[in-house]
């Protein structure tokens, strides 16, 4: 049985509608990081200089606002214990709703700390949310001209991945300023960021009083050797 012209028009309209809806959904779910990564050709690797005691590390906050005094004190004390001088980005303590200042303020802090010749490394104070909102506002060419350590994790992942994708700068998944910098974290940070050593990833020693520890057990999914860049 054939279709009438009216039914054919309805089917065409439905196909057009669903195609447009799918395209709109894909565009709506595309994050600034995904757009930045897709738009940028692969960049040659830029290695930041190793941090050394006496260097100045800037604290930035690209994400959530911090409402108490203690997190700032902890971040300062931690970096000083590592041997660094500490500089706060101009809007580190700013607040705008749930974020640490406006998008423009948070982005300008990132740009300014990369441009500052007195700053040798940049560490995020905390994570949270909102870091992806500043990615289109970053000056990636400026960052490429002034490569330096950039570290953080959680919501800061968007920032460090976007900077790497757009500039080639090797960035670091690292504790943020308010993290608990235990022996495990400090030893890996010093090895990778200060000594330039290739890290060996292993679980911390267990303090369980048992012949066969139950926590943090590891197993091999598929044995063998692999080689390649570690990104993510």
Where are these regions (language model features)?
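N-terminal secretory signal peptides and thylakoid transit peptides that target proteins
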Residues: 3-25
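C-terminal segment of N-terminal export signals and the immediately downstream linker at the start
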Residues: 32-66, 70
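Glycine-rich phosphate/diphosphate-binding loop of Rossmann-like nucleotide-binding domains
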Residues: 70, 76-78
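Mature catalytic domains of secreted/periplasmic carbohydrate-active enzymes
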Residues: 91, 136-138, 160-170, 179-180, ...
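Short, acidic/small-residue loops that bind anionic groups at enzyme active sites
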Residues: 140-162, 170-177
């Amino acid at each position: 049985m054939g279709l009438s012209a009216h039914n054919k028009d309805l089917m065409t309209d439905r196909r057009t509608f669903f195609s447009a809806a799918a395209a709109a959904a894909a565009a709506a779910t595309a994050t600034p990081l995904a757009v930045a990564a897709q738009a940028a050709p692969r960049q040659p690797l830029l290695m930041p200089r190793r941090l050394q005691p006496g260097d100045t590390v800037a604290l930035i906050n690209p994400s959530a606002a911090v409402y108490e005094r203690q997190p700032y004190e902890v971040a300062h004390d931690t970096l000083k214990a590592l041997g660094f001088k500490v500089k706060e980005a101009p809007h580190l303590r700013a607040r705008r709703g749930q974020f640490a200042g406006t998008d423009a303020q948070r982005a300008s802090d990132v740009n300014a700390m990369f441009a500052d010749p007195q700053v040798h490394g940049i560490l995020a104070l905390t994570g949270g949310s909102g870091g992806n909102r500043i990615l289109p506002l970053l000056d990636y060419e400026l960052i490429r001209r002034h490569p330096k350590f950039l570290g953080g994790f959680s919501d800061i992942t968007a920032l460090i991945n976007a900077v790497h994708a757009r500039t080639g700068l090797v960035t670091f998944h690292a504790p943020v300023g308010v993290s608990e910098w235990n022996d495990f974290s400090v030893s890996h940070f010093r090895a990778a960021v200060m000594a330039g050593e290739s890290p060996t990833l292993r679980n911390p020693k267990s303090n369980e009083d048992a012949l066969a520890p139950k926590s943090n057990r590891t197993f091999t999914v598929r044995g063998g050797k692999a080689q390649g860049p570690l990104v993510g």
